[in-house]
Amino acid sequence: MLMESYDNDRAWEAVSLAATLGGMVIGVAGVSAAHGLEHPASGLKNIVHGRGLAALTPIIVDRLAPALPQKFAEVSKILGGKDETDCADSIRKFLKAIDLDVKLGDLGIVQDDVQWMTDNCMKISAGNLNNAPKVFSKEEVAEIYSLAI
């Protein structure tokens, strides 16, 4: 509804409530790898956080799903998929349906930015990476950024 009309007060109310509830969850549980990898991108190029997350999340989910197959299978099924093996593709389809099918390259990130973002992520977002169900090496973080471009 909101994507069709920014003047829709009811839709803004629903989005605001969802954002508030999401913020409360983040306050208790913290955030995960997607947020940790996105912050350097949005800090470097002034990217809207949600668009940066859209560019990175499917790639990160591909790497996280084997660590928590039941949870990622559940997410996949909610989005019309079959199990954890197609969770990232289910997310990609959802993002396309809501016009958020973006790459970091579309948002101004270039390959020359990868080293700086990787170093920044490993230094500033280590807590977010540690909140993930698997360990992300510096090399893997750089690879995720490159794939997202």
Question: Where do the language-model regions lie?
Answer:
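Active-site segments that bind and position negatively charged phosphate/pyrophosphate groups
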Residues: M1-K93
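C-terminal charged capping/lid subdomain of soluble metabolic enzymes
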Residues: K82-I149
